[in-house]
From Swiss-Prot:
This protein's record includes keyword ATP-binding: yes
Pathway as given in its UniProt record: Cell wall biogenesis; peptidoglycan biosynthesis
Entry protein name: UDP-N-acetylmuramate--L-alanine ligase
Major enzyme class: ligase
One GO-annotated biological process of the protein: peptidoglycan biosynthetic process
Native organism: Psychrobacter arcticus (strain DSM 17307 / VKM B-2377 / 273-4)
Free-text function comment from the UniProt entry: Cell wall formation.
Family of the protein in this entry: Belongs to the MurCDEF family.
Cellular compartment(s): Cytoplasm
SUPFAM superfamilies cross-referenced by the UniProt entry: MurCD N-terminal domain, MurD-like peptide ligases, catalytic domain, MurD-like peptide ligases, peptide-binding domain
Length: 479
């Protein structure tokens, strides 16, 4: 059988009704939600191409695995494509979208493409305001350790594999479900996890928390009646929704009424030891290689689902011991020697006040002797406005605070929701004196500010992660 025939056979097995599609083009392919799906489709034997406005480590890696990448958007980029896949950030004014519509090519959302991948598999979708990426990564690691070899699509790089996604040999597909644009409603999984609910991305839901909660219920009701919902019982909003789900439910948390409970938590550096109590199972003592109580919750969610899917305790134990974390989730980048000590650089993606607070608490627990210096980049003017007071409170708890300009993510500025306003309010609170920095003065600020045995945390969902890489490459500018 020829190579092309083998590839076609593979595609027909994976997604039988997509036999008419040979070439998929992804607009915005460098995005965290797009690159994983593109990689899975490439691994299944489809021709995959993509475009993005800027080159990145992600686009470079996709090129290395054989995906054609164009930097910049141009109608010529979609030549010979059969279908166009777009992220929620791409609108009809994009020249590639315009060309596709003129050519009568189907233009589908990322979530719809993920939904097609999931339709022919045993899909497990992970939703929630916080912790989706880590929970998805933990569950993937557990099921792989249990020899279930799942396909996975994650919103961050799994450090152990260096990938956002991989094609497995089993029927399992594990994927993040994105509530930010309500696209998770396009998914129809066999089982689902909801880590928590919070008032974020409220513009999608008409600034109505009730509409947001109703969307989560609809997401869970997209499962068949024999599916399984795994939800955090310690989240009062989630717990109050259980009776409306209409599907089998298992709860997890630290409170004793949960189906799966963690007790006897002990922090040891960046590790957390805890015991899991489950009905009809012996207590299981575990060690998690990432810090923070929030990550114990993420681990509990994954353990609950993995146990139900038949992963044994030995595999769960090995998975947690081996887990190397996720890119930009409390990722330790560098340790730079200075005077009689060092400065530790940690990078974290968290951009909501609760996520930033969780990072700060995990850092304090892991490195209590270090001074905490945070370089924070607010993400979106709307989030800065909606969570302004919470940001002021949380950011006031660090020892030194550096603030970058708001990463707009395409939004127009909002009066009173910029970095200067945030700095003024934090200064008035009196706990810490914020310093506004940019790329031009960051080197001088680091040289002046950092001391032996500090930890510097770069925090946010914008391009601050790239700044962390540059800081690490230049020894934090302190040498």
């Amino acid at each position: 059988m020829s190579t092309s025939a083998k590839a076609l056979t593979k595609r027909l097995i994976e997604i039988p009704e997509m036999r008419r599609i040979q070439h998929l083009h992804f607009i915005g392919i460098g995005g965290s939600g797009m690159c994983g799906i593109a990689e899975v489709m490439n691994n299944q034997g489809y021709k995959v191409s993509g475009s993005d406005i800027t080159e990145s480590l992600v686009t470079k890696r996709l090129e290395q695995i054989g995906i054609d990448i164009n930097i910049g958007h141009d109608s010529k980029n979609i030549a010979n494509a059969d279908v166009i896949v777009v992220s929620s950030a791409i609108d009809r004014s994009n020249p590639e979208v315009k060309a596709a519509l003129e050519a009568r090519l189907p233009v589908v959302r990322r979530a719809d493409m993920l939904g097609e991948l999931m339709r022919y598999r045993h899909g497990i979708a992970i939703a929630g305001a916080h912790g989706k990426t880590t929970t998805t990564s933990l569950l993937t690691t557990m099921m792989a350790e249990g020899n279930l070899d799942p396909t996975y699509v994650i919103g961050g790089k799994l450090n152990a594999s260096g990938k956002n996604a991989a094609l497995g040999s089993s029927r399992f597909l594990i994927a993040e479900a994105d509530e930010s644009d309500a696209s998770f409603l396009s998914l129809h999984p066999m089982a689902a996890i909801v880590t928590n609910i919070d008032q974020d991305h409220m513009e999608t839901y008409g600034n109505s928390f009730d509409k947001l909660k109703a969307a989560y219920i609809q997401f869970l009701q997209n499962m068949p009646f024999y599916g399984l919902a795994v939800v955090c019982g310690d989240d009062p909003e989630l717990y109050a929704m259980i009776d409306d789900i209409g599907r089998p439910v298992l709860t997890f948390g630290l409170e004793p009424f949960n189906d799966v409970q963690a007790v006897d938590l002990v922090t040891e550096g960046t590790k957390t030891h805890f015991t899991v109590l489950r009905r009809d199972h012996e207590p299981l003592r575990l060690t998690l290689n990432i810090p923070g109580v929030h990550n114990v919750y993420n681990a509990l969610a994954a353990i609950t689902m993995a146990t139900d899917e038949g992963v044994d305790d030995a595999a769960i134990t090995r998975a947690l011991q081996k887990f190397e974390g996720v890119g930009r989730r409390f990722e330790q980048h560098a340790s730079v020697t200075i005077d009689d000590g060092d400065v530790l650089l940690i990078d974290d993606y968290g951009h909501h006040p609760k996520e930033v607070d969780a990072t700060i608490k995990a850092a304090r627990q892991s490195f209590p002797e270090r001074r905490l210096v945070m370089l924070f980049q607010p993400h979106r003017y709307s989030r800065t406005r909606d969570c302004f007071d919470d940001f002021v409170e949380v950011l006031s708890s660090v020892d030194e605070l550096l603030l970058l300009d708001v990463y707009s993510a395409g939004e127009s500025p909002i009066a009173g929701a910029d970095t200067k306003a945030l700095a003024r309010s934090i200064r008035l609170r009196g706990a810490v004196e914020p310093t506004i920095v940019d790329k031009k003065n960051i080197a001088a600020v680091m040289q002046r500010l950092l001391k032996a045995n500090d930890m510097l945390i770069t925090q946010g969902a914008g391009n601050v992660g790239q700044i962390a890489i540059e800081l690490a490459a230049n020894d934090l500018y302190i040498k």
